[in-house]
A protein has these predicted regions:
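Short S/T/G/P-rich N-terminal loop/turn motif that feeds into the first structured element of a domain
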Residues: 1-51, 60-68, 84-106
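Short arginine-rich
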Residues: 76-79, 83-86
Length: 106
């Protein structure tokens, strides 16, 4: 395994602007995929509005560049003001990764 870093974003959605949220989430996913250092992303959200997005990056520098992306920063501000009742971000270096891959992560 090559060195990688992970950003774990957990959130609880409000009921506000569901269509706008879905559109922005799709736009941010496409934008993240185009960023230098991006490896992969998986997201899930329950019926209760609680969600988690796990995004893998090649380096801390690529994560910092993603955070500075103007479109991403704008989406973050809209998320804080409209779409999320709470959220947290965890950034960590991946020391070990193993398991059985299945269709959930393809």
């Amino acid at each position: 395994m090559t060195e990688s870093w992970v950003v774990i974003f957990t959130s609880t959605r409000t009921s506000q602007d569901a269509d706008g949220y879905r559109a922005m989430a799709a736009q941010m996913e496409a934008l993240a995929h185009a960023q230098p250092g991006f490896i992969s992303m998986q997201s899930v959200r329950g019926d209760d509005g609680v969600g988690i997005t796990v995004c893998y990056w090649e380096s801390e520098q690529s994560i910092a560049a993603w955070k500075r992306n103007v479109d991403h920063a704008s989406a973050q501000q809209q998320g804080i003001s409209t779409w999320y009742s709470d959220y947290s971000v965890t950034i960590a270096k991946v020391e070990r990764q193993y398991g059985k891959r299945n269709s959930l992560f393809k």
